[in-house]
C-alpha cells in the first residue's frame, strides 16, 4: 500500500498497484510530486486523481473521474497510522478505544522513533507472537531472571480488541525454592556480581521501590518531569499489549 501525505497535512492510502497493468507504483519510501508508474507512465496526483495517460487517444474508454486511485480506509491515533483494505470495516474509534484508554496519561503522540530495529526469527510468526503474550516460558527459557521477575504472578487481561499481560519486576519467581533478600534481588535486577559493590538500599525502601526510583531518575534527562506521573509498576514491570493485527509486544 501507498500512504501519501496530502497538501493539507492529511494522509491518504492507495493500493500500490497501477490501474493499467498492475505494476508496483512505488518501490521505496521518499518524496514525489506525483505518483507515476515506471512501466507505461500512467500518473496520478498525490490526491489520487488521474494526471496523465501517455498516448491518451488510445484509451477512449478511460473516464478521468472513474480512474482515480481507489482509497483505502485510513485513520490515525497517537502518531500511528492504521489502514484496512476492507471497505466495510468497523469504525476505527470503537476499534481503538480500549487500547487508547490505557495510554491516556502517556502522550504517545509527542514521542519520536529514536531507532528502528528489526530481526528475522526463523519460526512460525504465531509462535513468536504467543511467546510475548505470557511469562510462563521464563522458568525454562530464561531461568537467569527468575530472581527478579514474578513470572507466574503475571496478570493477563483480554478485552474485545486488545489484550495485556503484566509481569511484575523487582520480585522473585514463586517457582524458586529459596528466599531472596532485597540485596539479592537488586543485584539480579542490576546484574551486579556478588563480589562487586552495590548501592545501599535506602531505609524504608525495598529492592523494587529502589529500582523504580533509580530508573525514574535515569529517565528524567530524556523524558522530563513526566516520569513523576508513572507509578512504580509502569517503570519496573513488563507490560505488553497486543492489538490485533496492529500492535504486538
Model-flagged regions — what are they?
Residues 1-105:
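Rieske [2Fe-2S] iron-sulfur-binding domain
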Residues 75, 80-249:
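C-terminal catalytic domain of Rieske-type non-heme iron oxygenases
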Amino acid at each position: 500500500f501507498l500512504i501519501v501525505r496530502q497538501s493539507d497535512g492529511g494522509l491518504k492510502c492507495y493500493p500500490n498497484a497501477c490501474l493499467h497493468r498492475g505494476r508496483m507504483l512505488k518501490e521505496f519510501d521518499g518524496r514525489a510530486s506525483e505518483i507515476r508508474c515506471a512501466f507505461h507512465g500512467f500518473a496520478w496526483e498525490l490526491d489520487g486523481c488521474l494526471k496523465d495517460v501517455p498516448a491518451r487517444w488510445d484509451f477512449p474508454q478511460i473516464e478521468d473521474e472513474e480512474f482515480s486511485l481507489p482509497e483505502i480506509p485510513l485513520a490515525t491515533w497517537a502518531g500511528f497510522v492504521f489502514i484496512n483494505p476492507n471497505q466495510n470495516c468497523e469504525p476505527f474509534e470503537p476499534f481503538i478505544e480500549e487500547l487508547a484508554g490505557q495510554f491516556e496519561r502517556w502522550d504517545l503522540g509527542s514521542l519520536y522513533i529514536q531507532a528502528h530495529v528489526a530481526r528475522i526469527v526463523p519460526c512460525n510468526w504465531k509462535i513468536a507472537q504467543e511467546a510475548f503474550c505470557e511469562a510462563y516460558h521464563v522458568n525454562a527459557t530464561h531461568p537467569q531472571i527468575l530472581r527478579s521477575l514474578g513470572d507466574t504472578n503475571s496478570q493477563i487481561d483480554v478485552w474485545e480488541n486488545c489484550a495485556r499481560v503484566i509481569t511484575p519486576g523487582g520480585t522473585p519467581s514463586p517457582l524458586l525454592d529459596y528466599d531472596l533478600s532485597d540485596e539479592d534481588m537488586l543485584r539480579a535486577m542490576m546484574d551486579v556480581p556478588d563480589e562487586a559493590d552495590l548501592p545501599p538500599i535506602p531505609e524504608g525502601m525495598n529492592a523494587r521501590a529502589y529500582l523504580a526510583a533509580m530508573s525514574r531518575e535515569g529517565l528524567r534527562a530524556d523524558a522530563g518531569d513526566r516520569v513523576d506521573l508513572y507509578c512504580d509498576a509502569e517503570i519496573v514491570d513488563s507490560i505488553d499489549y497486543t492489538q490485533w493485527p496492529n500492535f504486538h509486544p
